Every structure is written in C-alpha cells, then in structure tokens.
C-alpha cells in the first residue's frame, strides 16, 4: 500500500482516509464471529435485516460479519479480511482495485446482498452472458439466505422472461443487454409492456472496461428502413482500383482518398459525368466512399471475421469477436458486399445511448477491477467515482521482466516463438496475449510447426473459453488468447483442479507473454494480472518492436537511434523509456478523445433525461388526452362517447409516436451536425459551443414540433373503440426492430467522427 501513498496525496487524501476507516471496521469483524456462529439461519438473517433497516447500516463490522458467516454456511467460502474491506467500499460507492484471483465474484455478491437488505434494487453488471448466468447461479444460495431474490439476464431471453427476471432484488446481466432493454422500454405505449423495473445501484464487474474502454460505445435500437448499401456494380468497380494510382491512404491507415485518376475511372465505368455533381454527392459518392473504406482499410481477421456467411466485428478494446456489434451508416453493408455475402437490411436509428450515459441513469454506481488505479483520472472526471485499493491477501511473487525490444516486427515475432518454445520445453505453462485474431492464428500456426500443442482463444464462445482458460495453468499448456478472452475465470496452477499445483510452482508458475504493448498501460496490466494470483509465483514479459502500432503512433514525428544486436534485440534503458513515452502519448490521446466526445455527448444525455421524464408522464397519466383536448377541443368533444380509457390510450399512442419520432430525427440531425461542425462553427465560437447552440435550439423545436404534429394527427386520424388507427395515416411504428452496438471504429480519426475520412459529405 505504501507504494500508492503519493497517489492518495494527489487525490487530497479522501480515499486514503476512507481506507483507514474501512480497515479499522474490518479489524472488528472477528469480534462478532463467536456470537453470530451460535445463531441459527433464521436468527442470523433477521439480525442482518434489523441492522440494515431504514436504508442504512447501523453497525458495519457486525453487518460484514453476518455476511461472512452466511457466505461460509451457504457457499463454503469464508471471506478474507481484504474481501470484507472491498465489500464495505462497494457499499459506500467506490470502485475497488482488486488484483486478479482475489475473489471479486464473492465480494460483488456480498455487496449486492448488503445493498439489497438496505432496500435497494441492484443490477450486477457483467461483460458477457456467461458471467451473468454463472455468477447469479453460483451466488444464489447466499442471496436467498436473506430472503432476497436473484435472477440473470441473457441475450436469448424473450420479453416475458426478462420482465420476470427484472422483478428480482438483485439482477445479474451483461451491460449491453441491460442497455438494450432500456432502449426497448423507450418505445412502449403501455406501462405493462415495460420489462425493466428501476434499479438503485449498479455494481460493475471489470469496471474499467465498461466505464472507460467502452464508455462511448453507443447501444443502438433500429427499425426496418432501407439504408445506404453500396450497389453491386460500385463494389466491383472499387475492387478494381489500385492503391497509389487510384487512391491514397494516410500514414496511420485510417483514411482513404480518391485520386483524380481514380475518380475518373469510377465515373467512366459507372457512366456518370462527375461524382461530385449535386445528384451524386448524397448517393453515389457516399456509396463509393463506403465501398472504398471497406476495400482498402478494413482487413479480414484484423477488423472482422466471416463466420456462417456473416461479417462479425472484432472489438478492438477486448480483442474479441463481437456478435452484437455492427458498423454504422452503411459500412456494414459495404463490407458484406466486399466479401460477396448477402447484404443486411439497412435501418433507421430509433434511439441510442452510450454506456457512459447508461451508467449515469443509476442513482449510485460502484465497481471492481484489477486495474482501477490506472483509470483513476477517467473514473473521477467522468463519473465522480473514487478508487479504493484493496491489498492482496498474499504478497505478490510474480516477476515482471523488462520489455524485450526489437528493431523490426519480424525479429520480434521470431523471438516470441523462441521464448515460448524455451519455456514450453521446461513444462512451464504459458499464456500469450495477442492483439487480434489474425495475430493469434499466425502465432499458433508457427508454434504447431514446432510440434507445440496450442489452445487458441479468440473469444468466440464465452462458456467454452472459460473452460479452456481455467486449464491454462496446467503443466505444458500453451494458450494463445486475444486481450479479453477468458476474463472472469481464474487460472489456477496445476489446472482447474490444481492436481499438479506443486510441480507448476517449482517451474515458476504461469508465464504471461504480451506480443506488444497496448495503447494504455492499464491494458498491459490486465494481461500481467493473469499470473501471480493469491501469492503464486509467475512471470510476465512483453515483446516490443519499433514497428508496433503504439510506438509508431505515440512516437509520430520523433526520431530515435538504436543499436540492435545480431538478433535485432535492443537492450537499452533509453529505448525502453522511449517506448514508455510513446505509450503515455497514446494514453493521452485516448483521454483527450474521451473528454471531447463526452463534452458532445453530455448535452444529448441531459436532453434524453427530459425526454424520458416527458415519456413517463405521458405513459402513467392522462396528460396526453388533457393536452390534446386543450389544443383541439372540438375534436375532443366528438370523442366524448368513447370509453375514457380508450380515449386516453388513443391520445397516448398519438403523443408518444410523435415524441419518439421527433427524438429519433433529433439524434440523426445532431449526428449530422457533429460530423460537419468544423464547417458550421462561426469564427467567434468554438465547434463545441456551436454544437451546443444548435442542440439547444433544435431541442426546443423538437418539443414544440412533437406537440404540433400530435395535435394535427389527433384532428385527422380515425379514433374509435379500438383506439387510434395510426397505421391508416402512415404513422405505423417499425414492424421489426433490432439492437446492436456501434463498433469502436478502427477508422475513427482525431476528430472522433465515425468514419472521419468520408467527411461532411458522408450523409
């Protein structure tokens, strides 16, 4: 803990003071053990309820002791003092920094149970379906011991199953599914159709992944409507273009530009006079740019894979296949056309919410991760969350070797293979962390050519990968994994049953090898943390080349001289420091992008709150009828013979349709504004100021337009005992909707537009 003293001082000491108080409370827990052990289950549960009555805990030490005794009785797990400390910090609203293997699952369940006993509804948020279902079932005996209900949400559940699950006091669910349910509930016109019940607290597992890495990933609800898919001929013509002759790609390979020669070739083969004529700018040129981006910049097995005749994106922050993600605005269809697959239907975005805004809906949020300290600035700046560092139950014995730096990528890759082969020859288990699917497959192929058996995890199946990663610590195992594969599953030395534990300890424990530095040190530390759990020995080692993305990007514009040996190895502290500098530069770039993006997103998030409140009132009261009757009294008088409930629901359907439609149009408009804000900003205002001015003006117009449109429809639509016949007026809601996550696009440039190279003509 002493190593973090400077850190707590930098934060003004608040977290440090909380830590001292928490430790003092935990030190008293054991004083209650004898008395509580003598109580039967009913009396023990009642004691906890009494302590938490009124929404606050009267005696934290005794309360933690009760949770601990109940855990031992129901799960056979006695929490360590450091786990009880983490429970207390969660209950008080912190993000706790707990190393891998220190028992976060039990900590989260104890905290959720404690908050549930205080009368709060809790969502325990995970990163995937598998962990949500696993943790809910594993921790169920503890939660139900106190008379609380627990359930889980998963992708395959229908609306009825979800509705029932959300009634539980504690709900485990993947963050994307919870967000999608929020969006779907924003389209209901009858309260009983909602699936969610409001929750008071979000406990977020892998908090840095959700709150930082994926914070600005939009969750999208779309309805059926044709989109901007490139025509087949355009795809064929673009495929014939040659790099450098017909188009150029910028140095960081994020943007592609047609040359005059390329434009002329396209115009000739498409039979048009100019791509840049008004009639083609908003249609043909958009489709050409989409096809060109798909062809030149998006690489199979790096940015996406093709499986079962479908394009599946690879999530850059997790290094995993993301079944639910799509690229926006026709790029998905462009890649499908490039691969010769059936082009998926376009759609109109009905609603969208970022994960950051989703978490902001909870009155209280807290979380757990093994790399919270590195994300302290973001957690404090964007969520006002404090980090509490929880000491390890056993001292760390892992050895973190200095980076091995090579001049070229090829030399680095040869060294990685040699090192894995050397470690494997001793029987020491090896876990290799790669950055993408293609790299992991290439590495596995090279190792198999040396007759080394390899397990490859590309995060395609969460349950299967959990079983494989659980065995990664066994003798002689070599496991190659993308960044996030298998998180949430412990790697125990000697295999899942620890049968060969002693022998693996003698070999030095699990060796973790990183094939390159990540864009932030926090991601490196996530990989390092797989070794050395619970005081086990272990090794971590990263290989770096001067050609690696983080070095090229972070060191752009700088030059460095180095003298490699015959193998390409550069053994220089100066170069290691420079690589660290490059990584810090990329971290700063990411933080700046996050900050800029949040400044744009926050106003829309605030406007969403107003829309949500308006929607709630329209759903739950007679406000819709009252307003329409006030604006169109003659029409209201014509409907007096109808049953009151029919009249009110008809008015509700009308008002909600136009509110939802205009909100959807507002989102689309503001997306357009943001894409071209650098052109629309006037000289005396910053782009952000101009964006806010437009957003406020347009939102005011939205509010009035939604009412005016509703009044117009109210006057003209047929309303009878069956309600308002909106379909007859062409006002039907989409017949089909679907949800997806907009990818953290690999092509997003410094302006953070989704496809910055297409620019303001994109739409």
From Swiss-Prot:
Q: Which protein family is named in the record? A: Belongs to the SecA family.
Q: Which UniProt keywords apply?
A: ATP-binding, Cell membrane, Cytoplasm, Membrane, Nucleotide-binding, Protein transport, Translocase, Translocation, Transport
| Xref: InterPro entries | Helicase_ATP-bd (IPR014001), Helicase_C-like (IPR001650), P-loop_NTPase (IPR027417), SecA (IPR000185), SecA_Actinobact-type (IPR026389), SecA_CS (IPR020937), SecA_DEAD (IPR011115), SecA_motor_DEAD (IPR014018)
What CDD domains does the annotation carry? DEXDc_SecA, SF2_C_secA
| Topology within the bilayer | Peripheral membrane protein
Q: Which domain of life is it from?
A: Bacteria
Asked if the record carries the keyword Cell wall biogenesis/degradation, the reply is: no
UniProt: ATP binding residues:
83, 101-105, 490
What EC number(s) are associated with this protein in UniProt? Answer: 7.4.2.8
The protein's name:
Protein translocase subunit SecA 2
Q: What is the lineage of its organism?
A: Bacteria, Bacillati, Actinomycetota, Actinomycetes, Mycobacteriales
What is this protein's function? Answer: Part of the Sec protein translocase complex. Interacts with the SecYEG preprotein conducting channel. Has a central role in coupling the hydrolysis of ATP to the transfer of proteins into and across the cell membrane, serving as an ATP-driven molecular motor driving the stepwise translocation of polypeptide chains across the membrane.
Known NCBIfam families for this protein? SecA2_Mycobac
Q: Name one GO cellular component term.
A: plasma membrane
**Record localization:** Cell membrane; Cytoplasm
**Which reaction(s) are listed as its catalytic activity?**
ATP + H2O + cellular proteinSide 1 = ADP + phosphate + cellular proteinSide 2
One Pfam family of this chain: SecA_DEAD
Output the Gene Ontology terms for molecular function.
ATP binding; protein-exporting ATPase activity
- Subunit architecture: Monomer and homodimer. Part of the essential Sec protein translocation apparatus which comprises SecA, SecYEG and auxiliary proteins SecDF. Other proteins may also be involved.
Top enzyme class, one word, equals translocase
